[in-house]
Amino acid sequence: MNAPLQSASTQLAALDGVLRSIGEVAVAVSGGIDSLTLAAAARRALAGRVSMFHAVSPAVPPEATERTRQVAAREGWRLTVLDAGEFGDRDYMRNPLDRCFYCKTNLYGAIRPHTTAQVVSGTNLDDLGEYRPGLVAAKAHGVRHPFVEARIDKQGVRAIARDIGLGELAELPASPCLSSRIETGIAIDPVMLECVHEIERLVEHDLKPKTVRCRVRAGGVVIELDEACLAALPDERRGALTERVQALFERQNFTYGVSFERYRVGSAFLHFKRPVSDR
């Protein structure tokens, strides 16, 4: 789903119009480029009528929280950091296909007691063409999506980020929550997520890939790399990395075989896709 090609200033004007029509917003900030850009744009459009909320949990990469805190301090945001409590939700922890529904249900439920403002998310136009059970939770909680309302896609978000001075953050790669690395049906385990995060940082340091994901599947651990990095990986380094990955998991009493594959978006989801009911 593509938005018409427009200049960054035109898209920013459309976004400003949506935000001003809302009046007062509470931005759910994950630490990714979409929500950071929305928060920065809202601060400029609405001044003091904006608050930001960031949730921390074992599924949130520490660097996402640190990035959010740094931008908030620099931009003068009113930021609340909270625990959304999804790790106390059995439905979330059993990791069903619609796990994101339970994650967002907990997130929006945790934000609501702190504000009477309209809660908004960084969902953009491209997201509507993907499997996003979190959008069902957003609808149930009355959350609005200003980028969607302004017909702005991912490319437009990055253009706006550059236009409003977010600098190198405009090129920030996508980095979904750590629970997205665990195959559907394998229970979420905080210690396992720590291992996943540590391994991804290890591979980033050693190989400098454009993209890396450490997936935990029923058949073992899969290190997914962008095609160029995978093609250039010699057998010797692959073997050494395999041993280090296995050792990290074994240190936490997990035993897995390790393989390397080309990066595929959302490959930890099982292949079937069933509709998420409008609970």
Residue ranges and their predicted role:
Residues 218, 222-237:
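A short interface-forming secondary-structure element
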Residues 148-214, 260-262:
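Mid-to-C-terminal catalytic subdomains of enzymes
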Residues 2-163, 221, 239-253, 262-278:
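ATP-dependent adenylation/nucleotidyltransferase module used to activate substrates
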Residues 119-122, 171, 179, 224:
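Short, conserved beta-strand edge motifs with alternating hydrophobic and charged residues
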Residues 87, 183-185, 228-230:
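A short, flexible beta-alpha/helix-coil linker loop
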